[in-house]
Design a protein with these regions (language model features):
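Detector for the c-type heme attachment site
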Residues: 36
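Intrinsic-disorder/low-complexity accessory segments
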Residues: 6-7, 12, 18, 22, ...
């Protein structure tokens, strides 16, 4: 099986390409990726657990907690079990929560116990009956709670969303000013694949001229080089955060316990 929830950035499947195309038409301030997990697991909602990628802003982190507290209020009132700050991190860029996050939104995963084994009703390991209605009701409740708290904070959400992109086009995000991809004839197909990927993700690029100095991915050292006719991806652009996440040579990792994928830097591909 192919997991489309790991294909947001790469868009190798037609379903992913159509989904991201629609996403880019709307560019939401809030995006929730609804899932189901093992039937014995209680409901999961934000905030996520570490590691968080360092491009995630303090506002994005803070508002995840604000949303989680609003959900908890409703779940506590109903006596529904839930957990937060466990299992699901915000690191790998191709999930349905991180991809929106790296594009300025508050991106979150919500997980309901059930899955294919849930059926119309099932008895879990605790001896409780979990019905399809229960599962739908939990997702319905977090949906309305998300809308409610987002509406209450609409002004701040829009302000911070605008700031995210204003910062991207004024100063850029990250320590590197630009990324250079050598446009060697022998790598023609690989370069074309990269440019196709950049286009899919709305990342701007151009052709270089002259010489410069920077980090060499192959040697791991700072070197002088010519970049005439090479591909140059400027870090100062609307998708600056996504550029940093996809191209930086080494992402910071504050916790070695991650959900799964930890390596993806495009220049090494």
């Amino acid at each position: 099986n192919f997991d489309l929830n790991r294909d947001w950035a790469w868009q190798t499947q037609i379903e992913s390409r159509r989904r991201v195309s629609v996403y880019n038409e709307w560019m939401p301030q809030i995006h929730v990726d609804y899932h189901e997990q093992g039937l014995n697991q209680p409901y999961y909602f934000a905030p996520a657990v570490q590691p968080y990628h360092d491009v995630i802003t303090s506002w994005q982190r803070e508002f995840q907690s604000t949303i989680g507290k609003n959900h908890a209020k409703y779940f506590d009132a109903k006596g529904w079990l839930f957990f937060t700050k466990e299992v699901f991190d915000l690191y790998y860029p191709s999930y349905g929560d991180t991809y929106p996050t790296y594009n300025g939104a508050i991106g979150m995963t919500y997980e309901q116990g059930g899955g294919g084994a849930g059926g119309a009703a099932v008895i879990n390991d605790e001896g409780d009956t979990l019905t399809l209605f229960d599962r739908a009701n939990h997702h319905f409740t977090t949906s309305l709670s998300t809308i409610e708290i987002s509406s209450i904070n609409a002004g701040k959400l829009i302000k911070e969303f605008r700031k995210f992109f204003n910062d991207a086009v004024s100063t850029g995000i990250g320590e590197y000013k630009s990324y250079v991809i050598k446009n060697n004839p022998k790598d023609k197909e690989r370069v074309e694949s990269l440019l196709e990927l950049l286009n899919k993700n709305g990342i701007q690029y151009g052709t270089g001229s002259g010489t410069g100095k920077g980090y060499n991915y192959n040697s791991g050292k700072e070197e002088s080089f010519s970049f005439s006719n090479d591909i140059v991806i400027n870090a100062v652009q609307p998708r600056s955060a996504m550029v940093k996440v996809l191209f930086e040579p080494k992402a910071k990792l504050v916790d070695s316990a991650t959900y799964d994928i930890t390596a993806w830097a495009l220049p090494y591909a």
